[in-house]
């Protein structure tokens, strides 16, 4: 086996692993967003972990309203994951908006106080996963550029 073929197989295996990891992360975010968004849409403020006692009608109203956008984000993540080869352009934006959600939680924590203990790991994930997702996206894009510039995309070299 010559070096060009070995190089091509190494790139393909690594690219497949990165793409699969990226897709599964997007599917996981999608599942969490769909489940938790639907839960809050149906259950209102009582469905939020750590919520206890009566809640102001305005807060419940806002939570149910914004839960629809969380569900939509889940659908969008699913669509991008399912069509990653043609919709990879959206991955950095997904990472950015996920990070902004974490920043929102941090602002709330600093301004109001710590949330229910289950939401603290969620906030940590909202800071870590966007970096991982963007890193995978960047490396995947870089590999695609390398593959196309070396002629590996068409299966021929030189």
Mark where each language-model region is.
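Membrane-helix boundary elements
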Residues: 19-25, 32-60
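Core segments of alpha-helical transmembrane spans in multipass integral membrane proteins
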Residues: 31, 35-39, 59-79, 96-100
């Amino acid at each position: 086996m010559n070096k060009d073929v070995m190089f091509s197989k190494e790139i393909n295996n690594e690219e497949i692993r990165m793409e699969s990891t990226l897709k599964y992360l997007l599917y996981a975010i999608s599942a969490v967003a769909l489940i938790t968004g639907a839960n809050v849409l149906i259950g209102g403020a009582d469905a939020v972990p750590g919520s206890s006692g009566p809640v102001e009608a305005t807060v419940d109203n806002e939570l149910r309203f914004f839960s629809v956008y969380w569900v939509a984000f889940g659908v969008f993540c699913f669509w991008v994951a399912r069509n990653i080869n043609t919709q990879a352009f959206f991955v950095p934006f997904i990472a950015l908006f996920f990070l902004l959600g974490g920043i929102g939680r941090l602002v709330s924590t600093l301004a109001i106080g710590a949330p229910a203990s289950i939401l603290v790991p969620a906030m940590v994930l909202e800071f870590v996963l966007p970096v991982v997702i963007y890193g995978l996206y960047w490396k995947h894009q870089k590999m695609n550029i390398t593959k196309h510039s070396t002629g590996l995309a068409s299966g021929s070299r030189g």
